[in-house]
């Protein structure tokens, strides 16, 4: 389901470089599998794939079916890994434009999945409340600790709003949190909210295949079993060191990091994959960016950003590498019409497909950027479907673990994010 092409990037290295670093990469890979590396207690994201819980998947599907039946809007409150994974999968696989209402019910075929609690904009919350007025709303509050300021502040605003409008407000609130402790856990106990547990040993940025991501994804009408088992299949494939694309990706990134490269661009040519880019950005930024190490991850969308950042990528400082995330098989090609004239200068494209033009844009950018001194490689998804996307998610999670171990850091903690919180809470007068 995943293919990794690093042939062009290898031309920027000596012939023996990749093989020379491979023993270290394989050792990092064994640390992950044998649970001997730093942060090994946070490998719950692998454990849940090694022992799939089909009963949990069925329960999530049942809850999602109720929400799809009852809700106009499903509102997810979360920040970072508590929303980026779900948003990425939904943007990649759900319809991009709202379906027409059903004639008999005048209700959308699927509830609208919205996100809040991922920033501190009061204006956004006010406009959100106005938008929700008169709509049937369910809320999913996602926070392992129950102390995440952005998320819990949004819930503090929304809870009385829900209680004032829905007699069954407690049933409409679903929390995803620690199974045994924390403020959100205790609130669920007090008010009788339904709960889903974030499994032990799963950090936020690795939680997309837990109820954190699976419930919103299921509400959006996406097949979570195919998504989950696509990841299971990739997890099994990546157990071996031979023909291991995640190991190759981590090793290549490490080689360029050690040669002074500072930035990795993840470039997509399919707008639906932009959310995967945002999820990838957090995954690699929080996992690697410590002890003065790590490539700065930046996700961009082509061909749009070729008209803004393309100049820098082509001729700016030579301190970046570029990874393309592409889809091999595109469904339902759109043919460019023959309009009978050439007033727009595009008659040479008549009869070809928009997808073909997009592919040539990728091929052109790949060659031009490589010729301009940027090491480029490509991660290929087989198709834009739940199984392939699940494989993609696991591929990047596995790769970042190896990459962190290669750098000599714990890829599963994020001590630096506490610094701004301490200053913010001090300024707010929190005791």
Q: Over which residues does each language-model region extend?
A:
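Flexible loop/turn segments at secondary-structure boundaries
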Residues: 82-85, 122-124, 147-150, 181-185, ...
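Glycine-rich phosphate/diphosphate-binding loops that line cofactor/substrate pockets in enzymes
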Residues: 59-72, 128-137, 252-262, 313-318
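Active-site phosphate/pyrophosphate-binding segments
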Residues: 165-323, 328, 416-431
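Generic C-terminus detector
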Residues: 391-431
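Short, charged beta->alpha transition segments
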Residues: 62, 122-130, 250-254, 326, ...
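Extended, charge-enriched "interface" segments that sit outside catalytic cores
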Residues: 1-65, 339-349
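Helicase-primase coupling helices
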Residues: 298-383
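Glycine-rich phosphate-binding loops that contact phosphosugars or nucleotide phosphates
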Residues: 65-239
């Amino acid at each position: 389901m995943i293919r990794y092409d690093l042939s062009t990037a290898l031309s920027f290295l000596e012939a023996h470089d990749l093989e020379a670093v491979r023993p270290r990469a394989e050792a990092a890979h064994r640390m992950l599998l044998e649970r001997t590396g730093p942060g090994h207690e946070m490998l719950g994201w692998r454990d849940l794939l090694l022992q799939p819980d089909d009963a949990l998947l069925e329960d999530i599907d049942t809850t999602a079916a109720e929400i799809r039946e009852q809700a106009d809007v499903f509102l997810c409150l979360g920040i970072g890994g508590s929303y980026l994974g779900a948003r990425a999968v939904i943007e990649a696989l759900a319809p991009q434009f709202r379906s027409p209402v059903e004639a008999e019910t005048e209700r959308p075929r699927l509830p609208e999945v919205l996100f809040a609690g991922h920033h501190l904009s009061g204006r956004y919350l006010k406009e959100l409340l106005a938008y929700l007025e008169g709509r049937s709303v369910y809320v999913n509050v996602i926070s392992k600790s129950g102390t995440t300021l952005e998320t819990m502040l949004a819930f503090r605003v929304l809870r009385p709003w829900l209680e004032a409008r829905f007699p069954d407000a407690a049933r409409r609130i679903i929390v995803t949190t620690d199974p045994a402790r924390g403020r959100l856990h205790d609130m669920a106990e007090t008010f009788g909210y339904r709960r889903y547990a974030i499994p032990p040993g799963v950090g936020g940025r690795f939680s997309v295949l837990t109820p954190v991501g699976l419930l919103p994804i299921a509400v959006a009408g996406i097949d979570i079993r195919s998504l989950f088992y696509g990841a299971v299949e990739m997890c099994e494939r990546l157990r071996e060191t031979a023909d291991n694309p995640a190991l190759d990706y981590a090793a290549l990134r490490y080689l360029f990091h050690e040669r002074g490269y500072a930035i990795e661009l993840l470039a997509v040519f399919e707008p639906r994959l932009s959310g995967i880019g945002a999820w990838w950005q957090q995954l690699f930024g929080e996992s690697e960016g410590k002890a003065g190490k790590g490539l700065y991850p930046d996700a961009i969308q082509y061909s749009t950003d070729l008209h803004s950042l393309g100049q820098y990528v082509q001729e700016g400082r030579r301190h970046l590498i570029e990874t393309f995330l592409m889809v091999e098989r595109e469904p339902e090609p759109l043919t460019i019409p023959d309009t009978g004239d050439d007033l727009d200068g595009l008659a040479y494209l008549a009869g070809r497909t928009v997808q073909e033009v997009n592919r040539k844009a990728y091929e052109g950018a790949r060659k031009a950027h490589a010729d301009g001194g940027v090491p480029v490689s490509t991660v290929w998804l087989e198709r834009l479907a739940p199984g392939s996307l699940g494989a993609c998610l696991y591929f990047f999670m596995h790769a970042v673990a190896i990459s962190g171990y290669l750098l000599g850091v714990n890829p599963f903690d994020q001590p630096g994010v506490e610094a701004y919180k301490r200053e913010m809470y001090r300024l707010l007068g929190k005791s």
